[in-house]
């Protein structure tokens, strides 16, 4: 079957790449840079809380995700935070990338704005956030939040840290589309969003075989997606990785 042969190809390529190269790529991630700017400005505790809140409301954006995070990083690196909850709600109202469902975003942020994440135990943080916001731990913005909190930890402590294998990949549209583009699923990206657990299962298998945990694979897909979908390899993703996600016709930018 095509999916099986493509899965083998993806595993072999990413196994050769390895976790150390992925960690290097993470330092180039606009999300990492934005989080790092905020952590450097406000310290680990306040910076990680702001990053956590932004991750929790990072859905249905009116623009590219990279630009949303760049705006967040610039906004809070220039702001003197006096009242974290109030200041974050003001940010939601101000951001040009959060125009859809403003009140729903504010409601979700209010649920978590007093919570201080445990950066030493992100598994515990995931369980607690799941309870606080009333969502399953596999839900995309929750697991994405753990990735962002790891960025806050790495920036604050000046270290790399590999995340656990039992936290699944967040399945947003970019991940869904690249999974389809790689030939790993035979249903379209829109359906993949609904069947996100099936997509997570595939990337869990890739993670086990390559030694790259799912949340680190997410960074790789996110950065590669910019090249695949928009023809902009801004972060130096290896060409052989980009090629994995151009297996299907229609998975190259219009200029190619």
Curated annotation (Swiss-Prot):
It catalyses: 2'-deoxyribonucleotide-(2'-deoxyribose 5'-phosphate)-2'-deoxyribonucleotide-DNA = a 3'-end 2'-deoxyribonucleotide-(2,3-dehydro-2,3-deoxyribose 5'-phosphate)-DNA + a 5'-end 5'-phospho-2'-deoxyribonucleoside-DNA + H(+). The lineage of its organism: Archaea, Thermoproteota, Thermoprotei, Thermoproteales, Thermoproteaceae. DNA repair enzyme that is part of the base excision repair (BER) pathway; protects from oxidative damage by removing the major product of DNA oxidation, 8-oxoguanine (GO), from single- and double-stranded DNA substrates. Signal peptide: none annotated. Residues 125-184 are annotated as: Helix-hairpin-helix. This is N-glycosylase/DNA lyase. 8-oxoguanine binds at residues 31, 58, 69, 144, 170, 218, 222. Contains two alpha-helical subdomains, with the 8-oxoguanine binding site located in a cleft at their interface. Contains a helix-hairpin-helix (HhH) structural motif and a Gly/Pro-rich sequence followed by a conserved Asp (HhH-GPD motif). The active site is at 140 (schiff-base intermediate with dna), 172. One of its GO terms (biological process) is base-excision repair. Keywords: DNA damage, DNA excision, DNA repair, Hydrolase, Lyase. Its EC number is 3.2.2.-, 4.2.99.18. It comes from the Archaea. The keyword DNA repair applies. The keyword DNA repair applies. Highly thermostable. No decrease in activity was observed after heating 15 minutes at 80 degrees Celsius. One of its GO terms (molecular function) is oxidized base lesion DNA N-glycosylase activity. It comes from Pyrobaculum aerophilum (strain ATCC 51768 / DSM 7523 / JCM 9630 / CIP 104966 / NBRC 100827 / IM2). Belongs to the archaeal N-glycosylase/DNA lyase (AGOG) family. It holds the Pfam family AGOG.
């Amino acid at each position: 079957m095509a999916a099986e042969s493509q899965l083998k190809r993806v595993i072999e390529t990413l196994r050769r790449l390895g976790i150390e190269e992925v960690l290097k790529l993470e330092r180039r991630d606009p999300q990492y840079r934005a989080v790092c700017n905020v952590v450097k400005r406000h310290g680990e505790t306040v910076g990680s809380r702001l990053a956590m809140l932004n991750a929790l409301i990072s859905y249905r954006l009116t623009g590219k995700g990279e630009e949303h995070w760049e705006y967040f990083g610039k906004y809070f690196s220039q702001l003197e935070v006096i009242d974290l909850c109030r200041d974050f709600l003001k940010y939601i109202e101000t951001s040009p990338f959060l125009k859809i469902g403003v009140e729903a975003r504010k409601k979700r942020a209010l649920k978590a704005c007093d919570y201080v994440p445990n950066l030493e135990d992100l598994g515990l943080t995931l369980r607690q956030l799941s309870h606080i916001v009333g969502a399953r731990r596999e839900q995309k913005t929750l697991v994405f939040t753990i990735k962002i909190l790891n960025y806050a930890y790495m920036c604050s402590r000046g270290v790399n840290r590999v995340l656990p294998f039992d936290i699944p990949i967040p399945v947003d549209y970019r991940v869904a589309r690249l999974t389809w583009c790689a030939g790993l699923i035979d249903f379209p990206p829109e359906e993949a969003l609904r069947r996100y657990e099936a997509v997570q299962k595939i990337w869990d298998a890739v993670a086990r075989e390559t030694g790259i945990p799912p949340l680190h694979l997410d960074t790789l897909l996110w950065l590669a997606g910019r090249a695949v979908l928009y023809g902009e390899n801004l972060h130096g993703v290896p060409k052989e990785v980009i090629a994995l996600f151009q297996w299907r016709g229609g998975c190259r930018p219009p200029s190619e």
